[in-house]
């Protein structure tokens, strides 16, 4: 008889903690911490800090845990987006993928939060929290 019990695979964990500050009239990185499957790219130099979030695991499924924290410092400007459409893949029964995003803006700062669309696959199970 076949054993139909599948062990749970290790899941993706990742986080980004990014803050900006104003240096002269240009917004720059104040602090940056990246862990696990999450990375940030800064595609061009401009007066605004442009940040592109990348999930190197390719998507989220049950048991994954992703956390993004961004703070825009006083007077600075930041635009954050994702590299491509986010994907929530099929999850094992009882397994939930978690994405938590915390955004804060100090006095005189501005933030453009522009994530790409979310693609939900059959039987995906995702819990997303956005705290501004």
What name fits each language-model region?
Residues 1-99, 107:
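Terminal catalytic/cofactor-binding subdomain
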């Amino acid at each position: 008889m076949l054993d139909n019990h599948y062990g749970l695979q290790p899941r993706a964990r990742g986080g980004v903690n990014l803050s900006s500050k104003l240096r002269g009239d240009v917004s720059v990185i104040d602090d940056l911490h990246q862990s696990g499957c999450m990375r940030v790219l800064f595609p061009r130099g401009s007066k605004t800090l442009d940040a592109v979030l990348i999930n190197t695991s390719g998507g989220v499924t049950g048991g994954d845990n992703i956390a993004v924290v961004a703070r825009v410092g006083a007077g600075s400007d930041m635009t954050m987006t994702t590299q491509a459409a986010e994907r929530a893949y099929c999850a094992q029964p009882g397994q939930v993928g978690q994405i938590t995003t915390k955004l804060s803006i100090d006095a005189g700062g501005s933030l453009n939060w522009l994530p790409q669309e979310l693609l939900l696959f059959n039987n995906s199970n995702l819990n997303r929290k956005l705290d501004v």
